[in-house]
Swiss-Prot record:
<feature type="active site" description="Nucleophile">
    <location>
        <position position="85"/>
    </location>
</feature>
<feature type="domain" description="TRUD">
    <location>
        <begin position="160"/>
        <end position="310"/>
    </location>
</feature>
<dbReference type="InterPro" id="IPR020119">
    <property type="entry name" value="PsdUridine_synth_TruD_CS"/>
</dbReference>
<dbReference type="InterPro" id="IPR020103">
    <property type="entry name" value="PsdUridine_synth_cat_dom_sf"/>
</dbReference>
<protein>
    <recommendedName>
        <fullName>tRNA pseudouridine synthase D</fullName>
        <ecNumber>5.4.99.27</ecNumber>
    </recommendedName>
</protein>
<dbReference type="InterPro" id="IPR050170">
    <property type="entry name" value="TruD_pseudoU_synthase"/>
</dbReference>
<keyword id="KW-0819">tRNA processing</keyword>
<dbReference type="GO" id="GO:0160150">
    <property type="term" value="F:tRNA pseudouridine(13) synthase activity"/>
</dbReference>
<dbReference type="GO" id="GO:0005829">
    <property type="term" value="C:cytosol"/>
</dbReference>
<comment type="function">
    <text>Responsible for synthesis of pseudouridine from uracil-13 in transfer RNAs.</text>
</comment>
<dbReference type="InterPro" id="IPR011760">
    <property type="entry name" value="PsdUridine_synth_TruD_insert"/>
</dbReference>
<dbReference type="InterPro" id="IPR043165">
    <property type="entry name" value="TruD_insert_sf"/>
</dbReference>
<dbReference type="Pfam" id="PF01142">
    <property type="entry name" value="TruD"/>
</dbReference>
<dbReference type="InterPro" id="IPR001656">
    <property type="entry name" value="PsdUridine_synth_TruD"/>
</dbReference>
<dbReference type="GO" id="GO:0003723">
    <property type="term" value="F:RNA binding"/>
</dbReference>
<dbReference type="InterPro" id="IPR042214">
    <property type="entry name" value="TruD_catalytic"/>
</dbReference>
<keyword id="KW-0413">Isomerase</keyword>
């Protein structure tokens, strides 16, 4: 089983230097707010009823189950774009397929944990990963040094952070990774739900990504290049292989027109890294060959993820020793990776 430190962001290299101030976080759900950024149009008709839901201290799956029970259908009929934190106040869209039915009185679902704030009808369901970003509002209490936090926040605002997967991806003390490994390595893997399977596979791929990125930062820094690197274009998922770095490509990298990437392990017919970059990644993946074989057997498609994460529309305000941070991250990015760069939350719940 993996030691807890192996999935802890605290043990991974940071982009910004300097001592981080201490602070208190998540004393209440209101200290961590997440607003899904998704532009939708009300079609006025259709068999898919979309719900804009505010939830407090409840996870996304809990709300999906509650919606399904209320409508008297299988949870498979309920869709959402992404999972949101439990220990938080969050806003996100759900859709539920109810062919031939009038709009239900969804307000009957409202309670302290969940509130339906908007209802629309659409001809299409909400697909996973459909939202473009999340807006975060984070409150830090009793910050030990305003100057230290301001300096680190300026660095994050200008340069971004390392795009690690957050610790919540791995469960308590890395339990998701350990359980996923036991499941994959079993002579006869037990049948598990689709959601648990997705959770397990995501935990393994995220762990490998963090390991590769951390070692790359240790050896080469955030802008260190290797022949055969796979880079991603700004504002898209389009990637290409750099056969040889020249001055123009290095300038595009410095200007954040392109980004270095690391692998999300899986099956691929067309390797996207070559030469030095491929040799570096394979040297780190080799000890996990049994994981890689299992991912390929399960036909998990390989992908790439940027190493650098840019923070959009960053803001900071103060009330005494308490700071409020506001910023936007693309879907799939973690606010905890931003916090890890600027504040020491030792002993605090994440």
């Amino acid at each position: 089983m993996l030691a807890p430190s192996q999935v802890s962001l605290a043990d991974l290299p940071r982009l910004h230097k300097g001592d981080r101030p201490q602070a208190e976080f998540k004393q209440t759900p209101e200290d961590f707010q997440v607003i899904e950024q998704l532009d939708v149009i009300d079609d006025g008709e259709g068999e898919h009823q979309w719900l804009w839901v505010r939830k407090t201290g409840a996870n996304t799956n809990f709300c999906a189950e509650k919606i399904a029970r209320f409508a008297g259908v299988s949870e498979r009929n309920v869709s959402y774009s992404g999972l949101k934190d439990r220990q938080a106040v969050t806003w996100q869209w759900f859709s539920i397929q109810l062919p031939g039915k009038e709009t239900l009185n969804w307000n009957e679902l409202n309670d302290e944990e969940m509130s339906v704030e908007r209802i629309i009808r659409r001809t299409k369901k909400l697909k996973t990963g459909f939202h473009r970003a999340n807006r975060f509002v984070i409150r830090l209490a009793n910050v030990s040094s305003r100057e230290a936090l301001e300096n680190l926040w300026q660095g994050v605002s200008e340069q971004g952070v390392i795009n690690y997967f957050g610790e919540q991806r791995f469960g308590r003390s890395g339990d998701n990774v350990a359980q996923a490994e036991r499941w994959l390595m079993a002579s006869r893997p037990p049948r598990i739900s689709r959601s648990k399977r997705s959770l397990y596979l995501s935990a393994l791929r995220s762990y490998l990504f963090n390991e590769i990125v951390a070692e790359r930062i240790r050896q080469f820094g955030i802008e260190g290049t290797l022949t055969g690197d796979c880079v991603m274009l700004e504002g898209s998922q389009s990637v290409f292989t750099v056969e040889q770095w020249d001055d123009e490509l290095k300038q595009r990298l410095a200007n954040n027109n392109i980004y270095l990437t690391a692998p999300l392990a899986g099956s691929t017919n067309k390797p996207l890294v070559k030469g030095e970059a491929d040799a570096f990644e394979q040297s780190l993946l080799q000890p996990f060959d049994s994981w890689l074989q299992a991912l390929r057997k399960l036909r998990v498609e390989a992908a790439r993820r940027t190493i650098l994460l840019r923070v959009e529309n960053p803001e900071i305000s103060w009330q005494g020793k308490d700071a409020e941070l506001r910023f936007t991250l693309p879907s799939g990015a973690y606010a905890t990776t931003v916090l890890n760069e600027i504040v020491d939350l030792s002993g605090e719940s994440r």
